[in-house]
Amino acid sequence: MKTKVEEYLEKERISYEALTFNQTELNDFQKILKQKQIDQNSVCKTLVLKGDKTGVIIAVVPLSEHLDYKKTRKISGDHKGGFPGMDFVMASTGYPHGANTPIGIYRKHPDYLFLVDASFKEKQMLVMSSGEIGRSIKIARTDFEKIVPFTYAELVE
């Protein structure tokens, strides 16, 4: 069964590769990436933040990196901002922690601020959640740029 994001990509005729990871594989994710010949620096994590001026901010950063709050606040124009509680994340995105996907969030909330770390500009392919824990997609960066309007920015420490 396909996720809503996968169904949307097929409807729009956007090429992607579905990736599934069982619980054991999630525990040994780096090994699985190597087996599937996926550059770990092309794997995205989608973070949901709450700013005092902009409201919900969706930040997409490399899986192995940490978000720099100060840089993110400067880009968003917020004085205060950070990670809200899980209840807020679920209510604001419709996705549980670990399943947030920028494609799915944008389809429901095009008014949110979407920021993507500038390091992804150099990548041909990106791997990101497809909206369910253990489910991801591999998609061309150029296709991602066409379906989710976002700003590239230096977001990591």
Which residues make up each language-model segment?
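Extended, low-hydrophobicity, polar/charged segments
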Residues: 1-157
